[in-house]
Amino acid sequence: MKIVVVGGGTSGLLSALALEKEGHDVLVLEKDKVGGLCRSENIDGYTVDIGVHAITMLNDGPLTRLLNNYARYIPNFREYGDYYVRTDKLQKIPVSMNEWMT
């Protein structure tokens, strides 16, 4: 069966992978860049995270089943420290909701 998946973000790509493994002919359509909001860009020599790059504390559900059954997922950890650059200054990455709000 020919199937079109609209959206090349995490969910779209995993869905397309699962459908292809089941023998379907899959076409993924993405209006921007593959990966959706889960990607990095190089801007003026800096690697900038565009969106989500970590999914933590996953409970058993559709996403974990797709990852476990169809993806050869090997975590890639990079040492960047606990800071990010904001207005030419290093800012500590907040670890709680209250810290994000201030």
Curated annotation (Swiss-Prot):
Q: Which residues form the signal peptide?
A: none
Which species is listed as the source?
A: Methanothermococcus thermolithotrophicus
**Phylogenetic lineage:** Archaea, Methanobacteriati, Methanobacteriota, Methanomada group, Methanococci
One Pfam family named in its UniProt record: NAD_binding_8
Q: Which InterPro entries does this entry report, sorted A to Z? A: FAD/NAD-bd_sf
Q: What is this protein called?
A: Uncharacterized protein in nifH2 3'region
**Gene3D superfamilies per the UniProt record, alphabetical:** FAD/NAD(P)-binding domain (3.50.50.60)
